[in-house]
Design a protein with these regions (language model features):
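Alpha-helix boundary/capping residues
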Residues: 51-54, 70, 87, 112
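Short secondary-structure transition/capping segments
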Residues: 41-42, 73-75
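Basic helix-turn-helix/winged-helix DNA-binding cores
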Residues: 1-68
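C-terminal regulatory/oligomerization modules of transcriptional regulators
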Residues: 74-131
Length: 131
């Protein structure tokens, strides 16, 4: 099938599919006489796998490593487990950063009352301050 059909089946943009191919995460089955890339059903499964990994915020490098590990069914699973543990650590860091951001935004929101004019807005004054 052509790349447009793959895009529709996977709900992944054509440009992203081409990018994944350039990063050697997938490969086309060949080309048509008109020089269009053609893909088989295995690529659909690979793209769904990649999409699922990206939803877990795994990097393309991690996905490549997992794909490589999948080629050896006897390989130990601890490397994949470690990737997930590392991902959990990264998520915790992001959550801490988001909590700090929330605190900052709440403080900003509290600095502005609805009875003031924009010229008196504490939020705007804060944002105009140089760092």
């Amino acid at each position: 099938m052509k790349i447009g059909q793959v895009s529709k089946k996977t709900n992944i943009p054509v440009q992203t599919i081409r990018y994944y191919e350039s990063q050697e995460l997938i490969q086309s089955s060949g080309r048509t006489e008109g020089n269009f890339r053609i893909y088989n059903d295995q690529v659909i499964d690979q793209l769904k796998f990649i999409k699922h990994c990206r939803l877990l915020d795994l990097s393309l490098g991690d996905i490549k490593r997992i794909n490589k590990l999948c080629t050896n069914a006897q390989a130990p699973c601890h490397e994949v487990d470690q990737m997930i543990i590392d991902q959990i650590k990264q998520v915790k860091v992001k959550m801490d950063e988001l909590k700090q951001l929330e605190t900052q935004l709440k403080a900003l929101s509290n600095s502005c009352t609805q009875s003031k004019k924009v010229s008196d807005c504490g939020i705007i004054k804060y944002l105009q301050e140089s760092f």
